[in-house]
Regions:
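Histidine (H) residue identity feature
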Residues: 38-39, 52, 99-101, 153
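Segments that shape or occlude catalytic/ligand-binding pockets
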Residues: 33-72
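A contiguous, low-structure linker/loop signature
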Residues: 70-120, 140-144
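Short, charged low-complexity intrinsically disordered segments located at boundaries
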Residues: 42-51, 77-82, 166-167, 224
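Active-site loop segments of alpha/beta catalytic cores
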Residues: 1-42, 113-231
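Hydrophobic transmembrane alpha-helix bundles
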Residues: 61-72, 94-110, 180-192, 228
Length: 231
């Protein structure tokens, strides 16, 4: 697959960018948030996308745009993820946040179980047969194949399960059950990564949010103690 106006394939250009080997252009992916389609004029948005084919190479104009929302992007429809955390959002298309933490009380930990990495990425249900087939087709087309953990795979996952304040107190107090919970999340992530590695992707990614606008969400000392071993 080639980008119009360039000689390198998209895959080769990405590999060169990763290796700092003089790519023809900086690889990027630009999205319009799905909520935009019910907040702004759809024709104006489509005009914008149509005028930038480099940024939106697969754009096809539609009479009416009806986005497909993810399970935690639906207003007035709380979503319980595979870790039993309940997500809510105030606007269709905006990814929600966890409002009910499954282990807001440690008393439920004894019977708490991790989901199956063969059936979910931790946030949504998945079908590895479909993923496997899509990877196969992508490779046949010469595409750059990316695998990896979902966003918020460890620190944010623990925050969703326990709640931010309780998680921080657990780290300060050296709560023994926290170590067991971290191990549970780590084992799930490792199995998920192994499943992806079997498909031999070009790149693996591990996206996570660890900082705020002016600094980290936890001290470097706590990060080194609880998260460096996992990473």
């Amino acid at each position: 697959m080639q980008t119009i106006g360039f000689s390198l394939s998209q895959r080769e250009n990405k590999l060169r960018a990763i290796r700092f080997d003089y790519p023809e252009y900086i690889p990027m992916t630009l999205y319009l948030n799905k909520s935009c389609w019910h907040h702004y004029d759809q024709n104006a948005l489509q005009d914008l996308m149509e005028s930038h084919p480099f940024l939106f190479p697969n754009f096809k104009r539609q009479k009416v745009v009806r986005p497909e929302y993810l399970l935690n992007q639906l207003k007035d429809a709380p979503y319980t993820d595979p870790w039993k955390c309940v997500w809510e959002t105030m606007d269709d298309g905006i990814t929600g946040s966890v409002h009910q933490h499954q282990l807001g009380d440690w008393s439920a930990f004894e019977k708490y179980e991790a989901p199956d990495a063969n059936k979910t990425d931790g946030t949504y249900p998945i079908d590895w047969n479909i993923i496997r087939e899509n990877v196969k087709k992508g490779k046949a087309r010469g595409e750059f194949i990316t695998g990896g953990l979902p966003h918020g795979h460890t620190f944010l996952r623990l925050q969703d399960i326990r709640g931010y304040e309780d998680l921080i107190f657990d780290m300060i107090d050296e709560e023994p059950r926290l170590f067991k919970l971290i191990e549970m999340v780590e084992e799930f992530n490792c199995q998920y990564v192994k499943n992806w590695m079997e498909l031999k992707p070009d790149m693996m990614k591990y996206p996570e949010d660890l900082g705020m606008q002016v600094g980290p969400m936890i001290s470097p000392e706590l990060f080194r103690k609880y998260f460096t071993p996992v990473y």
